[in-house]
C-alpha cells in the first residue's frame, strides 16, 4: 500500500511540470478580438484585417466579436472584465480611450489602469471638407467664419463625437471662431447637408469623402495629419494649410485586460510586430487612408493613450461635453 502511494506521488511529481509546460504554451485555443462598434464600420474593417494577421502569426484562430453600444464603452467593458489570460483582446479607439474617459460623468473604466497595452495598428486622420461654394482654402474658410460670426454652421456625428471635438479643437487652434454646431446622428447626414448647402463644412475620414471630393460634390480642404495621405497626396495637411501643429484622427490599438502575464504580452507583442511588418498590412491600411504604426511596442502604446487623453481632456471640458 505504501509503495503504491509513493509511486502515485512520484507520477504526480513528474506530471506537474508537464502540466505547467502545457499551461504555459500560449496560445493553445481560439482568441477573441472585441470590436466595440458594429460590423461593417471602419473599426470593424481594421479589426478583421488584424485578426486575420494575428491568426497567421499565432497559429490559432482569432475571431472578431462585435460588442457595440455606448460609444464603444460596452465593448471596452467586455474586455476590462475578461480573464487576463490573453484570449480576449480589444480594438481600442479614440472613443473608448481618448474621449469617453473624460466625457462620461461616471466613466465605467479607467483607460490606463484597467487595460494592458499590446500594440498600435494605425491612426485614421480626419479631413475637413466644405460645400463647393465655400472658399477653396483653409485660410479662406477660416477668414469667412471670422468675418461673419454666428452666420455659418458646421456638422458633426453627434455631441462628443471625434468630429465635434476635432472642430472645437480647430476653433481653439485658430484663436476662436463663432460658428454654429449642428450635431447629427452619424457622419452621413452631415455629408448630405454639406453637399446640399445647409451647413458650411464638417469633418470625416477619407474613405467616405474622397469619392465625393473627386466627383465635385464637396471639397476637401485639408488632411488632419502631419504628413499627406498616400491615396490623395494632392491634398495639403492642416499644418500646410495654415493651422500649426493641428492633427485630429481616430486610432486603432490592441489592448487586453489589466493583469496579463508578461510572457503572454510578449507573445502577442511579437505577433503584432510581425503582422505590422507584413507589406500587405501596410498596403491595406494605406489603401483605406490610414497611417500604419509599424514601430509600435506595448510601452509606446501605453504612452500614446496617455498623450491622447491629455490632448482631448481640456477640449472636452471646454466644450462642456458631459455624458450621463
Where do the language-model regions lie?
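N-terminal export signals
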Residues: 5-22
Amino acid at each position: 500500500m505504501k509503495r503504491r502511494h509513493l509511486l502515485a506521488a512520484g507520477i504526480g511529481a513528474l506530471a506537474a511540470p508537464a502540466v505547467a509546460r502545457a499551461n504555459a504554451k500560449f496560445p493553445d485555443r481560439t482568441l477573441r478580438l472585441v470590436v466595440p462598434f458594429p460590423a461593417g464600420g471602419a473599426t470593424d474593417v481594421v479589426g478583421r484585417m488584424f485578426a486575420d494577421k494575428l491568426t497567421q502569426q499565432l497559429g490559432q484562430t482569432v475571431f472578431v466579436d462585435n460588442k457595440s453600444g455606448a460609444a464603444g464603452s460596452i465593448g471596452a467593458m467586455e474586455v476590462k472584465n475578461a480573464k487576463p489570460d490573453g484570449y480576449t483582446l480589444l480594438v481600442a479607439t479614440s472613443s473608448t480611450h481618448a474621449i469617453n474617459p473624460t466625457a462620461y460623468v461616471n466613466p465605467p473604466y479607467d483607460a490606463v489602469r484597467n487595460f494592458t497595452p499590446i500594440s498600435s495598428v494605425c491612426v485614421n486622420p480626419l479631413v475637413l471638407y466644405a460645400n463647393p461654394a465655400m472658399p477653396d482654402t483653409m485660410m479662406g474658410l477660416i477668414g469667412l467664419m471670422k468675418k461673419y460670426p454666428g452666420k455659418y454652421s458646421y456638422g458633426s456625428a453627434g455631441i462628443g463625437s471625434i468630429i465635434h471635438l476635432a472642430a472645437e479643437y480647430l476653433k481653439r487652434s485658430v484663436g476662436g471662431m463663432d460658428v454654429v454646431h449642428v450635431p447629427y446622428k452619424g457622419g452621413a447626414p452631415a455629408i448630405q447637408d454639406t453637399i446640399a448647402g445647409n451647413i458650411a463644412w464638417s469633418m470625416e475620414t477619407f474613405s467616405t469623402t474622397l469619392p465625393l471630393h473627386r466627383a465635385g460634390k464637396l471639397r476637401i480642404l485639408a488632411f488632419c495629419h502631419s504628413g499627406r495621405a498616400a491615396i490623395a497626396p494632392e491634398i495639403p495637411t492642416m499644418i500646410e494649410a495654415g493651422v500649426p501643429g493641428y492633427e485630429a484622427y481616430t486610432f486603432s490599438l490592441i489592448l487586453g485586460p489589466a493583469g496579463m502575464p508578461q510572457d503572454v504580452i510578449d507573445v502577442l507583442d511579437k505577433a503584432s510586430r510581425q503582422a505590422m511588418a507584413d507589406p500587405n498590412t501596410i498596403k491595406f491600411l494605406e489603401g483605406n487612408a490610414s497611417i500604419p504604426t509599424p514601430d509600435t511596442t506595448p510601452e509606446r502604446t501605453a504612452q500614446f493613450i496617455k498623450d491622447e487623453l491629455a490632448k482631448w481632456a481640456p477640449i472636452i471640458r471646454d466644450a462642456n461635453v458631459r455624458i450621463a
